[in-house]
Design a protein with these regions (language model features):
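Acidic, Ser/Thr-rich low-complexity segments on the non-lumenal side of membrane proteins
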Residues: 96-126
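A broad, low-specificity signal marking well-ordered, structured residues that form hydrophobic/aromatic
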Residues: 82, 119, 143
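Short secondary-structure boundary/capping segments
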Residues: 74, 81, 111-113, 134-137
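N-terminal membrane-targeting/pre-transmembrane regions
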Residues: 1-50, 142, 176
Length: 176
């Protein structure tokens, strides 16, 4: 038998098969990251070339530095790919975003608090707060997926997760 041991239980290789992926859109990636870098450098340039009062100069330098940090974080985050298998949603850096067994619902509605071109997953219990700009975020029991991602890929993944949740819940009803 082949497989992987995970949480002291046997996992079949078929459960690790990738069902859907989300890649960041290159055009959005260039535009978003490029805009942030231009903003960062512009703010720092203004602070150095035409120094206002010392307090404002420090504020502009800090703002420029934070913008550069966010730009770099976004560049690294959008370099990853999100993968969905039968057990979990994860990114290619190895971070498990959410396990299928912990998911309660998926919301893609127009009025959902979700990223652009994305969807919102509600979890049974809260998890560690984290943010990967342009790809996904997690606050408490909510996971937002999307941002610099193509709409068709996120729609397919959202529908796949919804089908998996529905199947799981129906199987639980059958067992009762």
């Amino acid at each position: 038998m082949t497989g992987y041991v995970r949480n002291m239980s046997f996992v079949k290789p078929s459960e690790l098969e990738v069902l859907a992926t989300i890649h960041s859109s290159m055009g959005r990636r260039i535009l978003g990251i490029g805009s942030l870098y231009v903003l960062s450098l512009s703010v720092i340039y203004v602070a150095i070339s035409q120094p206002p009062a010392l307090g404002w100069q420090l504020f502009l330098l800090v703002l420029g530095g934070v913008s550069i940090w966010i730009s770099e974080k976004m560049r690294r985050a959008t370099g990853n790919v999100l993968e969905l298998n039968h057990l979990e949603l994860r990114d290619t850096s190895g971070v498990v975003i959410a396990r299928i067994e912990d998911m309660v619902s998926v919301d893609r509605g127009a009025f959902a608090f979700k990223p652009s071109n994305g969807f919102l997953i509600r979890l049974r219990a809260g998890a560690e707060r984290t943010w990967q700009p342009g790809m996904w975020w997690r606050f408490g029991t909510c996971v937002g997926v999307g941002g610099m991602t193509p709409g068709p890929q996120t729609k397919f993944m959202a529908e796949t997760i919804l089908a998996m949740i529905t199947k799981r819940d129906l199987d639980l009803l059958k067992d009762d």
